[in-house]
UniProtKB/Swiss-Prot annotation:
Lineage: Eukaryota, Metazoa, Chordata, Craniata, Vertebrata
UniProt similarity note: Belongs to the TCF25 family.
InterPro entries: TCF25/Rqc1 (IPR006994), TPR-like_helical_dom_sf (IPR011990)
Species assigned in the record: Mus musculus (Mouse)
Its job: Component of the ribosome quality control complex (RQC), a ribosome-associated complex that mediates ubiquitination and extraction of incompletely synthesized nascent chains for proteasomal degradation. In the RQC complex, required to promote formation of 'Lys-48'-linked polyubiquitin chains during ubiquitination of incompletely synthesized proteins by LTN1. May negatively regulate the calcineurin-NFAT signaling cascade by suppressing the activity of transcription factor NFATC4. May play a role in cell death control.
Phosphoserine carried by residues: S602
Record GO cellular component, one term: RQC complex
Protein name: Ribosome quality control complex subunit TCF25
Keywords, ordered alphabetically: Cytoplasm, Nucleus, Phosphoprotein, Repressor, Transcription, Transcription regulation
Length: 676
């Protein structure tokens, strides 16, 4: 690529600046910047005496077209070639350097000399150009380096503008499988593709100039109905950087800590109005926004619930560290810190709203963002969800790539959702008509191979899946011992929980007739292998007994956040009896506290009579003396029993009516009456 193309790429095209009579000069300088600036325009049509020291006079300005092309050919990768200057120009420069203005001539002679010099210069430069064409083999490596530099410039421009051309993904997206694209974090981008820009932005355009906001954000757009933003005391700091990863943590200042303590008191009071009062003084307190959003969602006010989540997301994004990147996939947030959990939960709830809104591509990008914050531990277990979002977004290539890159060290095939979603992605990819025939055939074969392995490893998935899809299997399948009722009953409880989670979330993806016919073919293939005594069947049975003895805590946390009834019903009793708060469900057992909650001197005085009565009936109720002995170290168990208290109070208030009580009459205030 020539230098002129690079100038156009940078927005520095020639011919856009005002031209003067003396501006049309061809000057060869050592510095590129000096060459692009050019001389200052003169006042007259004739060149003054001092101007002759800087360039050559050009009478016909159209001759500069060929001259610029030749000038670009003299430069390869920012270095000038070893060709010499034309004799007329070099001798003229030497003469002017030695003799000053002694070379001035009459106008007629100068015109003839100028035309002859131009013809000689153009002829010599053409010869040099032909020689350079013959030397392309020598400069091949340098030209390839130049193309790589151009690719880097294009990637930098695309990253800064948030725009990428259709086609193969850029090099930066191939560096990491959790690479996040900025433009896909905006749901309007996906809605524009579905409904058009006029339908999406038609009502938003008149409101754009009503208010000025302090910062441009990627995750959400501030609204004019929100309170004016002021720093709530939330910030982010860089803990350390090692092995190419940067570890960050959110911080609370003293003002925000006071708001956090008031929030915990409001939660213990079981009164949502107390949280509303707190938001009037601290409108961008994240945990209060999360808790109030759940209350609005339970009351089926989805619009208000989503608005509160977006406000919490905006508050946390404004506190980002300058080095914190959403797209690189190399920034980490430790979930063991309570300050960081709010960001995880806010992203998860925003992702859930986007999926329900009909934006699976944007929800997939949020899922990758959450997974990139701590991919090794995966505190919210996003690997149980990312396959579902990829299939809904019809991004089959990404799901296949994630499976191929992570199967070796994460054993994704041992999760029922990946075991069934990946072959489904291969099959749906084989149904596309814009791919070559050999790729379609290869995808179909891989899909059949993987679905047979999934049915062999998880036979208890088939019959519930057919029941969800309202499909009645034939007698050979339903009566066979491998897929019969014993297959679902004999599987471990932890595996049954994963199966219930997957089927409750993704069963509708299997309802197409083409998918069902393909599944039926492979079911019969598996039955033939079972009847033939394939050793892989027994190996899978032994593996199920060893791997799925008990689900880890992050899977239980994911099931609670998913709110899928079938999966929640399969939770063990030790999880369901714990206190589960919406702003911090199932906190880690090794929580890292940066500050502790101050001890309350009289906690009994802050509760209403009904709450105190039921609190005294709880098994974990403690007196004031026992509370003093526990101290602040009992912070992780401060919410024990609050969930059961909430259910008990709601049940009692639902059955308690003041109208059922008989009001005494005024003429008989003491309630005395006749017994007859």
């Amino acid at each position: 690529m020539s230098r002129r193309a690079l100038r156009r790429l940078r927005g520095e095209q020639r011919g856009q600046e005002p031209l003067g009579p003396d501006a049309l000069k061809f000057v060869l300088l050592d510095d590129d910047d000096a060459e692009e600036e050019g001389p200052k325009p003169g006042l007259g049509g004739r060149r003054p005496g001092g101007a002759g020291k800087e360039g050559v006079r050009v009478n016909n300005r159209f001759e500069l077209i060929n001259t610029e092309d030749l000038e670009d050919d003299l430069v390869v990768n920012g270095e000038r070639s070893d060709c010499t200057l034309p004799d007329s120009v070099s001798s003229g420069n030497k003469g002017r350097a030695k003799h000053g203005n002694a070379e001035t001539k009459q106008d007629g002679g100068a015109t003839k000399a100028g035309s002859s010099e131009q013809s000689n210069a153009s002829g010599k430069l053409r010869k040099k150009k032909k020689k350079q064409k013959n030397k392309k083999s020598c400069t091949g490596e340098s030209s390839e380096n130049g193309l790589e530099d151009i690719d880097r410039i294009l990637e930098r421009i695309e990253d800064s503008s948030g725009f990428s051309h259709p086609g193969p993904p850029p090099l930066s997206s191939r560096k990491h499988v959790l690479y996040v694209e900025h433009r896909h974090l905006n749901p309007d981008t996906e809605l524009k593709r579905y409904f058009g820009a006029r339908a999406v932005l038609g009502e938003q355009r008149p409101r754009q100039r009503q208010r000025v906001y302090p910062k441009c954000t990627w995750l959400t757009t501030p609204k004019s109905t929100w309170p004016r933003y002021s720093k709530p005391g939330l910030s982010m700091r860089l803990l350390e950087s090692k092995k190419g990863l940067s570890f960050f943590a959110f911080d609370h200042n003293e003002e925000y800590q006071q708001a956090q303590h008031k929030f915990l008191v409001a939660v213990e009071s079981m009164e949502p109005n107390n949280i509303v009062v707190l938001l009037q003084t601290s409108p961008y307190h994240v945990d209060s926004l999360l808790q109030l959003s759940d209350a609005c969602r339970f009351q089926e006010d989805q619009e208000m619930a989503r608005d509160l989540i977006e406000r919490a997301l905006y508050s946390m994004e404004c506190a980002f560290h300058p080095l914190f990147s959403l797209t690189s996939g190399t920034c980490r947030l430790d979930y063991r810190r309570p300050e960081n959990r709010s960001f995880y939960l806010t992203l998860y709830k925003q992702m859930s709203f986007l999926e329900k809104r009909g934006c699976p591509r944007t929800a997939l990008e949020y899922c990758k963002l959450i997974l990139s914050l701590e991919p090794d531990e995966d505190p919210l277990c996003m690997l149980l969800l990312i396959d579902h979002l990829a299939l809904r977004a019809r991004n089959y290539e990404y799901l296949i790539r994630l499976f191929q890159e992570w199967e070796a060290h994460r054993n994704l095939s041992q999760l029922p959702n990946f075991a069934f979603s990946v072959p489904l992605a291969y099959f749906l990819l084989s149904q596309q008509t814009d791919l070559p025939e050999h790729e379609l055939s290869s995808a179909r074969q891989q899909a059949s191979l993987l679905i047979q392995q999934a049915l062999t490893m998880f036979p208890g998935v088939l019959m519930p899946l057919l029941e969800y899809c309202s499909v009645r299997p034939d007698a050979t399948v339903s009566n066979h011992r491998f897929f019969g009722p014993d297959a679902e009953i004999s599987q471990p409880p932890a595996l049954g929980q994963l199966v219930s989670l997957y089927l409750g979330r993704s069963h509708f993806l299997w309802k197409e007739p083409a998918i069902m016919s393909w599944l039926e073919e492979n079911v019969h293939e598996v039955l033939q292998a079972v009847d033939a005594g394939d050793p892989a069947v027994e190996a899978c049975e032994n593996r199920r007994k060893v791997l799925y003895q008990r689900a880890p805590r992050n899977i239980h946390r994911h099931v609670i956040l998913s709110e899928i009834k079938e999966a929640v019903a399969a939770l063990p009793s030790d999880v369901t009896t714990q206190s589960v708060m919406g702003f911090d469900p199932l906190p880690p057992l090794d929580t890292i506290y940066s500050y502790v909650r101050p001890e309350r001197l009289s906690p009994v005085s802050h509760g209403n009579t009904i709450a105190l009565f039921f609190r005294s009936l709880l098994p974990n109720y403690t007196t004031e003396g026992e509370r003093l002995e526990e101290g602040v170290a009992g912070g992780p168990n401060r919410n024990q029993g609050l969930n059961r208290l909430m259910l008990a109070v709601r049940d009692m208030m639902a059955n308690f009516h003041f109208n059922d009580l008989e009001v005494p009459r005024e003429d008989n205030p003491e309630g005395e009456g006749d017994w007859d």
